[in-house]
Structures are given as C-alpha cells and as structure tokens.
Swiss-Prot record:
Residues 30-199, 227-403 form the EngA-type G domain. It holds the Pfam family KH_dom-like. Signal peptide: none annotated. Associates with the 50S ribosomal subunit. Keywords: GTP-binding, Nucleotide-binding, Repeat, Ribosome biogenesis. This is GTPase Der. The keyword Manganese does not apply.
Amino acid sequence: MAKAVKKEIAKSEEVVSIKAPRKEPGKKIPVVSIVGRQNVGKSTLFNSLLKKKLAITEDYPGVTRDVLSARIYQEEKDLDFYLCDTPGLDIENPDSLSQTILETAYRQLRESDVIVFLLDKNLITTADHGLLNYLRREDKVANKPIIYCVNKADKELDEFDLEEFYRMGLSEVLPISAIGRKNLGLLLEKIQFFLKDKPGKVWIEKISASKKKEAQPLPLAEEDYEFRLAIVGKPNSGKSSLLNAICGYERAVVSDVAGTTRDSIDTLLEFGDRRLLLTDTAGIRKQSKTAEALEFYSYQRTIKAIESSDLVIHLLDAKKGFGDFDKKITSLLQEKGKPFLLAVNKWDSIEDKTDKTFKEYKEKLYSRFPLLNEVPIITISATERLRVQKLMDLSFDLASRSHRKVSTSELNKNLKNWMGLAGRSFSAHQPPKMLYCTQVSTSPFHLILFVNHVEYFKSNLVSFLKKKLTETYDLQGIPIRLEFRSDRK
C-alpha cells in the first residue's frame, strides 16, 4: 500500500501559456533528461520545472513507468528544449515488464543532449555508484554534458555536507530542492549553457529576433498542432500498443500487465502536412479500485485528458466485448461532448471469423448501448498494425466534421419540416412546435430550440431529431445537444 500522498509542488506563479514557434523542417529541439535511481525526486523536479503536475509524484518507489516529456519554451531567456522524466534505473532482478521499462529509459539517455543526474542528499547507495559508472563508461552517453544535482537540500549546504558526493569523483554538484524550488533557476541556467552549441540554437535566435520580448514566467509551450487526440479504454485493452503502432516505434511501454501506463503520454505526430498531439492515457478503472493515491491520480489524469482532448478513440478489447465500464466511458464522452470513435482491438484474436462476424458484433454492441448506433466503429489489431492507417484516416475525417456549422435559416427550415413529419406521433398532447432555433457550438453540435411547450418534447422525439441531424449533416461520432426553451412569455 502506498503511503499518503505528499503535497510536493510548491505554490508558484501561474503558468503563462504562450504559442511556441513550430520547429523548422530538419531542425532538432534539444532534449534534456532527468535520470537517477528510484525515489530521489525525479518526477517532482520534472513537475517543478514545468510548474504543473504532469507526472505522478508519490513517496513510493517505481512510480514513473514511461518516459514523460514536455516542451519548455521561454523566448526572453533563450530556452527551448524538451524535458524528459525517466523511470528509476535501479530495478533489481527485472521481469519482462521491468526490462522493457529499463530499455526505454536507457534509450532515452542515449538520445538526450543534456543529462540531469539526480541524487538524494540523505542517502548515497550502490545503485547511485552503478548509474554513475554507466554514465561514464557508455560510449553514447559518456561525452554528453551531465549536471549533477543533490536533491532535498532544503537548507544551505556547505562543503562538508557535500564531501561524500565529491568523493564519488564529481567535480561540481548543485544542491537543489525540487519541492521548495531552491536553485531551480540556477539549474535552468546550467541547462541553457550546455545547450548553447546544440541543434536548434540558430533557429531560436532567428525566431527571437523577430518578436517583441515580454517578461513572462516560465511557460509550458503550446505546440502547433491541428487537434489533440486521446486514446482511452479499460486497462490492458491495448492503448499503448496502439500508440506504438501509430508512432511506428515503441514510444510507450507495452505489456500484457493491466495498467502498465500510469501517466498520460503526449506524442506530437506529423502525417504529411497535418499535425496532431496524441495522448495515451492511464487505463480507467472502476472508482472502487482507485483507493490508492497512485491509481487515484491516474484516474483523474485520464478524465483530464478526455476533457482537454478535441477527439477521442475509445478502445475496446474484442474478446472482452462492451462491458458495463465501457458504458461508463461512453457516457463520460457523451457528457463531455467529445467527438469519438470506437476501435475494436485484438480483432485478429477472434477465431472462426466469417463475413457476418463484424455485423453480429455491431448488432450486439448496439443492443447494449443504442447511442452507439451513430458512432463510427472499426476493427483493428494494434500489435499487427492491422487497419491502423484507416483508423487515423477516420480520426482526421471526424476532426474535420466536428467543426460543422449550419446556417440558422437552414436549421430552422429543416427542423420545422421534421417536426411536421413527426406530427403527433411522438406526443399525446398538442403537436410540439418549434418557433426558432440557433446553433451555439460545433463540438458538441449544440442547438438551442425555442418551442411552445418543453414538456411536449419527449425522449423519442428528441432521438428522432438527433437522428435526422446526424444523417443530414454527417455528424456520426459527434455528440448532439438539443436545449429546449419555452417561448412563452
């Protein structure tokens, strides 16, 4: 059982979100990675430098399972780099999952431009020495700039306090407090110094020279992308495998262990001249299973990912079908008004398939949750990359359709015609009448209808109108909200 969660992020000035320049073709934005053994405060430092709680922080070893990354851009200080939080590198006797985690972390080290090696003021272990030896010996790492930071130094440290670290052969160490934000400005200055000759420097200066500089707190950059796509679903439905299939390499840790992904992972992708930000979320669990603080944070982050997304892929496990909790996910997507489509993963594992198998699957699905009748659905295999490209084509199509705007005159004409077709068939009272309607948003497709009697518009009539709107304006997968208001004075 995890210990009680610590409130590790000190209150600071509000994050100012600004538009970061899109990188020029062929230009590389430098990468800075935080490394160290488990439980030295890597995720806390990551969050503190970003000034937002993106990584899960918990006084419990091994919380970070994936490499998290976020771009830090601050024009007036000539800062532009990707900051990465890596898993602890001191896993003993790793199983297959842990081995994959380690391989991902070590690959990240080799791809980094600057490394921040984090140590704990209160304890130096054999694992620290082992990691230090690796950094010194590994060919693809040894020549990289390394900043040695001693964390949890909440009070001033003199040379005597740091003597044990100097005995490790470190010529210079920087005492910091990730929680208290002590010396983080100095750490950023050191990072900036080592990045001076790295790729991207010329590009940063070129952009800076053309823009007016304004004093701002360190911002979290907003990337130049078309839309944000989130992948959600039950644990072990194959979300990380799908992310990897889309990216074309192992961006997230993949395992058959449910809930491998604890953090939400953002990946910026380019398809031709189109860009999207892809988010792989922690598996949503029933609330009763999120008692531990770690699972609670993962659940909350998944909800937040849905709220901040423009489009969602709801991933199902072909063998497990559409369960009660999948219904909760779909209801949540409807409630939040998010355009979404269904991807039935692991379709290759279904045996004895015929031409009717998919049709029968959809009929069974629609009988359990009729609202899914108007949602695009596709079968895929993430591990075999089966129909993954078609899934992305559907996603781009849905993104384009989610901005559908209809003129007020056309809406009024069509809705009044449909109301005339309905007549009294949907109401035992006088015929329901619509006097006027207007569209107030595109995603969800939200209409306000001024009517004679709100109570005359029963659920069956509302469903009829939604169906006509979906068919007429190609709104499959886009939630429709009809808000009825009485026009009576």
